[in-house]
Structure formats: C-alpha cells, structure tokens
Amino acid sequence: MLFAKILALAGLSAAATVETSSVKGKAFDRFVIIYFENQNYDKAFGDPNFTWLANKGITLTNYFAATHPSQPNYMASIAGDYFGLDGDGVVDSPAEVATVIDLLESKNISWAHYEEDMPYTGYTGSSYKNSRGRNDYVRKHNPAIMHKSVSDSTDRLSRVKNMSNIDTSRSSFHTDLENNALPQWMFITPNMTSDGHDSSVTTAGTWCRWFLEPLLTNSNFMQNTLVLVTWDESESYSIRNNILGILVGDAVPSQLVGTTDASFYSHYSEIATVSANWDLPTLGRWDVGANVYQMVANKTGDTIRTWDNATEFQSYYWNDAYGGYFNSNDNLPIPAPNLSLDSNTFNGRHILQSVKDTWANSDAPTYYTDSIKVSDSQHPPPGFSP
C-alpha cells in the first residue's frame, strides 16, 4: 500500500535534474554535508561508530551550532543567517534571500539535496510518514526547500531529490551514484530514525557507518571529495551548543588523518569553506567572517582566526535565537547583507553581484561584520533582541 501511494505521488513530482560539473577546487572537488540530529559533543564522540569515522579523518572539536531548535540551523547552513527563527514550523524565506546555491551557480558548480525517504523529487510538504505512521522525511531538515528562491523554481526543485535505502531502484541518490552523475556539492539528510532524532546516537552511528563506509572506497563518490559529518544542534539547551564535526574523504591529506582541529567553526563555516575552495563570492552575511576549515585554509591561504577574549568567548552559548523576521515574538525586517563587506574584508572576497543588485537600494538594517564573533540571544545584534 505504501509503495502504491508513493507511485501515485510520483506523478506529481518534479523531474529530477541530473547535472554534473568538474570545476576544480583548491582543496577538494566535491563537498558533501551530512547532518545528524540533536546530540551533545561528548555523547556523539563516545559512540563507537562515530569514533571509527573520526579516526579516518579530522575531528573538529570546537564546532558550534547557531541556535535551537533544529530548523534555524539548517537555514543558517546555506543562507548565512537564521533571521531570528525560533521554531520548527513551516517557513518560506523571501526570494530576495540568497543562499550558497546562488554562489555555486555563479560558477556553474553542480549541486543537489538528497533527502532520505522524501517521497519524490521536489516535494514541498511538511512531512512524510512511513506505513507505521512515524515520521520519515520532515521539511524542517531540508535547508533548500525553506527558501522561496528554491521552492518557486522548477529547475532548482528538480535538484532537491529523494534517497531511499530500502528501495534503491527509486532512489535518485543511488541512481546518480551508479551513473557517476553525482554533483559537486551535496547536502544529505537521513530520515528521522537514521539521524538519531526519533531514535538514539547508537542508531545514528550505525546508519552513518553503514551508509558511508562503502562510499569511502567508491570511485564514483570519492573524487577528491571532502565529507562533513556533523549535527544540527546539541541535545541539551542549557549548555553551550557545541557539536561534533568530522571531515573525511580522499581530499583529506594523509598526514591529517586521525588528527583534531580545535579552531572555532560554526555552520557558517560550511559556506565560507565552499567560497574559499572554489573562489566564489560571499552572501554578505555571517559567512563573511566565518573561519574556513584549517585543512582547506592550508591550500587557499585563508587565515584562521581566534576570539581575542577567551572569557567573552565562554559567555556565548548559541542556545537561543536572537530577534528577527521569523521570530515568534517579533515583527522585524530581513536584515540586508552588509554591502560594505564587498572585498573590504580580511579575506578580500567580493559579495555576489546579484546580492548587491538586489539590496543596493534597501533601507533594511544590517548587522553583519567580517569578525568571527557571531551573535546569540545573550549578545544579539543591535535592534534584534529576542
């Protein structure tokens, strides 16, 4: 019955676009992001399967999520901000908000989202349940679909694809893998059981090893590939939002396998690293000041910066949202990208031209800088208190 339902729904789906590219990067040629759910650093690192994975790459020990709950972290990971979002309900970011997708497309770098057990390519519903009535796919864990710049575009929707590990014959991920047609940038979201949200860190670790171990030796996947395995947020809201990050893949230099990196990173580092690797512009938001992963910075020449005040750093928890457009208590505008950060920054990168054009005459306030210091609810941007 469930399979018949999927077949019926498939008639409404967007046709999946298969597009490859071969834009050389300075440190990697393919970047894959995999998010797991709601786990404190120590508990994630203590799982034997995640420890196994960490021993095959670089452990990022000082990685921080943006806030709580889940959805704003997914939004931040591609948009360079979460705009005060403090819930998991359906949101649609206005079309003028650019994302990393715009950066990638500016240089014709292929991209896709692969969402486990999403019923079909381009699905925009809030969730999809399995035959037992449990959540498999949820929209709040799909960063692309919460942006109108994607959901209003048939072409972009065709790159938001399904992944099935039960029936690989209907899985866009497995089809693209078999055909050596995976894109250069990927965001992979396990389902609500696989990611640990409705299960446990043990289940998540088991799934991660089962899924990734064969891919680490698959030549259709490993093509100077860097994989980031991380979490959307920590489990405990009362402590600092420190999460585990692991970098693996054949792009990791052999001398760095099994090492740790204690540099300060955030979800915005995911965007900054992509910009540095492929000489892409920025979004003019929190991505401008974010640290690039050290192994990538070794190739790009980026400077890894530290907080200038250790006591101040310890006072940032990133465990609650500052105010903003999506905040349930506010009625504030989307802040403008800081257009003064166009090449006038420590890294010298320009802001994407379409972003400059869109926001050139905006009177919206802005609060972004090229500092690595990122606001939280206790240290909100001016005028954006929660």
Regions inferred by a protein language model and the residue ranges of each:
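Fungal secretory targeting signals
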Residues: 1-17, 274
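N-terminal pro-sequences and low-complexity stem/linker regions of secreted or lumenal proteins
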Residues: 16-386
